[in-house]
């Protein structure tokens, strides 16, 4: 009894210490207190539970909040501990363990994660089925001395060739006169007994001098390096052995052979590295005793071999169905697959290596021969026993031995002396199965989620339909037509009986519906699932068709682009050919450009200055226009325009005549063939004038001489009867002349040099249109500034020889005022 927290918190059933004063209490007092204390404590705890107060909460404080360690942090701590343990084990193994001069741990050629099974690799190296981890040399020279080779093999600085070698580079053999050494050698060669046998005589016979002396293989002291190494190796590979059935089998016991640093009178490092070879993958120099691939017999060091592994599990999407007609069932089912590693030299699948060990034994070995150790050839022959003297024939040059024993054919991956990458990493099947199970769980969860969502949506739709049906029925009952409200009120006592009768009559139908509701729901679910599958199949077909249509549309678009490009190239080629042949619109009858001479000569206008030595160009222009008019024949006046193309530039030009009659005929023909869209310009001219436009286009003179009303009319229409009317090129005279020349070149295909005068071509003029069919021809508005020639052909002034009218006088005054 009491309020002490220690009394209440102490367990009554806990054993009392001998120093506890309660242990010396009387028996009856202890029995009485033991019977009363639990009852009182239970009552107090019950009361505390009723009031929400826990025992001891008043006197004790809450412990501070401690942050729990996450899974990632635990994994990181675990990996760090394993890394530190590996570093310690590496240092110990490099100092104490070796196999024929090689090591059982990697030497840092690759700094990545070592995910291979270290216990399996260690066992294979001790069995001499896999080459040990030799120390690789960055450089090697055949001129090195023995001490330099020993220093390079041990990772020490390379001394000078003529320097005195240090003591650590001089191997010290064990003297044969030493009794401890001889006893150690004898004891190390004895096969240790695994346990007590049934024969006691054998125990007595073995308990002599040999068993009483210390032996590294049978000493039970805790300082034995073999037990410690096996314990550390087992601790490092505990996680891998859980998922690996091959490591569950107890490995044979390891023993250490007697220390002998010499092989045939040479240091062991010199014997190994004097005929070194280079690994084709890491480019380091190693002893010639390397692994060789089973397929192409290429050398590969152990550090490079243990880095090669299978690819991660993946789907067989990239595998050709046509090439591999007979695929494994995993690929046909669409499951994850894991392909074996390929040879880095010939890409043969299922990479495996073979190893021919050196003809001596040093370091670690197994006490009892394993089933695979009898097939090792040279390593297990009589010349390479544990303590035999090696003959010179067996210690021949390893290079010559390798060349004489070089394999000429590949070995099977299941051969007993072949070590594959799957043997080094035996957990690949477990990883593949775990990945497949993970994918299956995800797929099942996704399918269940989609199915549940689909069924829930359908159930909600059915519930809404059922509620709507009932509501419509109730609404129909509520809105049933009656004779009147009074009649309904008078018949209200009889409604319950009618409702009961209706319910009794409807009860059999509802019972049948309820009994068949379960089957209906299951059938509806199956039908919905089938509908969903059909919908997904139809959607897949639609997407495939849409993709095919898109591909066809793109192909057609590319074809159209290609056709347009070819058409443009053909047009360019045709134009280039036309220019090179001299048949273009800018060439004359002689093939040379005559723009300055004939293309800009417009005879028959009687305007412009006379240029010297231009009679030939005038004659050529007149002959070209005459031949074009003769070729047109008696066709419609629009034929010239239509032949010129769709630009509206085909205009027939009149010819200048020597007589007045021929000039009148030419003017009438030109006026009849003038297009309707041309600007009317009037030009008074003397009948007998022989003149032409300037050979070089002068736009300013033409623009200054054209006075047209804003309404499109012709200024000075009163003078059209007295003077001739002929078309004059306006702002686009050069382009019109070019089009005329093009038409002329096409028309005179029979004779390009034929000359026809105006009086011969005037007979073939096309008939003029009536006034109602076409508008009046354009007229030329002549200003006082327009140049002209007199009757004699000499240029006396720059004014036309006509009388100015009143309108011209007004215009002249306005121009003078504005100037």
Curated annotation (Swiss-Prot):
Disordered: annotated span: 1-79, 190-226, 367-419, 468-522, 549-819
Listed Polar residues bias regions: 409-419, 674-685
Coiled coil stretches, renumbered: none
Primary subcellular site in the record, as a coarse category: cytoplasm
Biased composition (Low complexity): 28-37, 210-224, 374-402, 479-513, 575-604, 613-644, 697-714
Keyword line: Cytoplasm
GO terms under cellular component: cytoplasm
Record's subcellular location: Cytoplasm
Sequence ranges of Basic and acidic residues compositional bias: 1-11, 65-79, 549-573, 743-772, 798-812
InterPro entries on file: Sip5/DA2 (IPR039301)
Its biological purpose: May negatively regulate the SNF1 kinase.
Family: Belongs to the SIP5 family.
Protein name: Protein SIP5
Gene source species: Pyricularia oryzae (strain 70-15 / ATCC MYA-4617 / FGSC 8958) (Rice blast fungus)
